[in-house]
Amino acid sequence: MTSKIEQPRWASKDSAAGAASTPDEKIVLEFMDALTSNDAAKLIEYFAEDTMYQNMPLPPAYGRDAVEQTLAGLFTVMSIDAVETFHIGSSNGLVYTERVDVLRALPTGKSYNLSILGVFQLTEGKITGWRDYFDLREFEEAVDLPLRG
């Protein structure tokens, strides 16, 4: 997705670094674009039945229904307003992304550009695993929204 996200200092100056070079990378980039729909029912179509999703600071969700419920729950408290993938690569069935998501806390209206490392596993064109690594405390403090229990 092309957006107004300022390129982080860590990002490659080579725009091809964020372009897909394999079918799995293409699917992941399509999914990244779809995230801004903030629609769990639309997003779950990218997932296999036997899947998992985890924002690494938080508990995992196993199975398609649990992943959809987790996403739907997240979208009640935040929206994903933009996603910019600066680096993407893959090896041995894993796709890695370095990206910035613009997240807005719905209760406070505050937005924050969150740097995220995402790891995706795909089988037959469907996501079987998705793990995002980021600093949860940094996000919570920036938008005044505690997500941890």
Curated annotation (Swiss-Prot):
The keyword Hydrolase applies. Its EC number is 3.3.2.8. Pathway: Terpene metabolism; (4R)-limonene degradation; (1S,4R)-1-hydroxylimonen-2-one from (4R)-limonene: step 2/3. One of its GO terms (molecular function) is limonene-1,2-epoxide hydrolase activity. Optimum temperature is 50 degrees Celsius. Keywords: Hydrolase. Gene3D superfamilies: 3.10.450.50. Monomer. This is Limonene-1,2-epoxide hydrolase. It comes from Rhodococcus erythropolis.
